[in-house]
Amino acid sequence: MKFEVIKKDGNARRGILTTAHSVIQTPVFMPVGTVGAVKSLDAFDMSEILDAKIILANTYHMYLRPGSKVVREFGGLHGFSKFDRSFLTDSGGFQAFSLRSNTKNDDGGIKFKSHIDGSTHYFTPRSVLDTQYELGSDIMMILDDLVALPAEPKRIDLSIKRTIKWAKEAIDYHKFMQSKGVGLQQNIFGIVQGGTDYEARKFCAEALNEMPFDGLAIGGLSVGESNEAMYDTVEAVMPFMDELRPRYLMGVGTPEDLVENVERGVDMFDCVMPTRNARNGTLFTSFGKINIKSAKFINDHAPIDPQCQCYTCKRYSRGYLNHLFKARELTFFRLASLHNLHYYLNLMKEMREAIEVGEFAKFKRNFYAKRSTDEL
């Protein structure tokens, strides 16, 4: 993997990330394909219609069903899904956190019960990499110890100690496996934990900087803290994250979150929001969100967003989409998801262009000036 920052505007960075499967312009948003597919969309939609260069798949879900060994027999995620660009796989730590009534963390890893059949499993720093080797992702995330916020200082301290310990185990194991010819084209990212405790974040980031990770992520945010606390935490930890490596903010977020955190120096994002909101009838536009379920759109001949050049907006009206949603027609999920993902990917493109010409501050002012905070 190669990463190069080609332009800076304040702390905002414009870069190029190259993997074995694609050249990725950063800052980048990664659509979430939890089980190897972005909900309601296929590989053609992702590559030919949306031109996405990288998507995220989930180790926890692929491990449980169909199993990473099955995926390996199809040629990994690329052969299985037919999406021939880059995949990032997360470690499953967040799923263990979100299903924490069925999980128990200890110093060795995470014990959990399958949400599918109740069977018991144990993730360790090595086992999650073994699963990701079989999945064949371009970027693998290490196992980390995530805590809900707010958290007691004692629990945050335990979290960063475990995360650093697991990071060392993971990077040593990855080097060993590569010496055996495994995962030679796969890259590994460390994850900085620490809640909203700036000193804990600094300590964790500095420890991970000393390890030869290909990139660094900020984990454990957007889990209950305010937006301001998230932004302040990112701003506080960023000076302690290696400038030469890509920086990934996990599980974030709204369009506003993307703009605010690009301004603070983040290069990579993922979130289920654009596709989840699409399925629920909330569509993103340059002027804010619209609720396509509303009766006021029944006779509306306009596209979702007159300024949008997506597949859906060039072909279909708000009135038609309102009808499809109310009829629970499956076509709606695809058309709405294509629109929302186009909006997110185009937002990233606009930010890259603004950074290139040194006008990110102007872009941010215009972004907020034309947006309504209310659902329209």
From Swiss-Prot:
One of its GO terms (molecular function) is tRNA-guanosine(34) queuine transglycosylase activity. Residues 251-257, 275-279 are annotated as: RNA binding. The active site is at D90, D270. Binds 1 zinc ion per subunit. One of its GO terms (cellular component) is cytosol. Its cofactor is Zn(2+). It catalyses: 7-aminomethyl-7-carbaguanine + guanosine(34) in tRNA = 7-aminomethyl-7-carbaguanosine(34) in tRNA + guanine. One of its GO terms (biological process) is queuosine biosynthetic process. Zn(2+) binds at C308, C310, C313, H339. Substrate binds at D90, S91, G92, G93, F94, D144, Q193, G220. Pathway: tRNA modification; tRNA-queuosine biosynthesis. Its EC number is 2.4.2.29. Keywords: Glycosyltransferase, Metal-binding, Queuosine biosynthesis, Transferase, tRNA processing, Zinc. Belongs to the queuine tRNA-ribosyltransferase family. Homodimer. Within each dimer, one monomer is responsible for RNA recognition and catalysis, while the other monomer binds to the replacement base PreQ1. HAMAP family: Q_tRNA_Tgt. This is Queuine tRNA-ribosyltransferase. The lineage of its organism: Bacteria, Pseudomonadati, Campylobacterota, Epsilonproteobacteria, Campylobacterales.
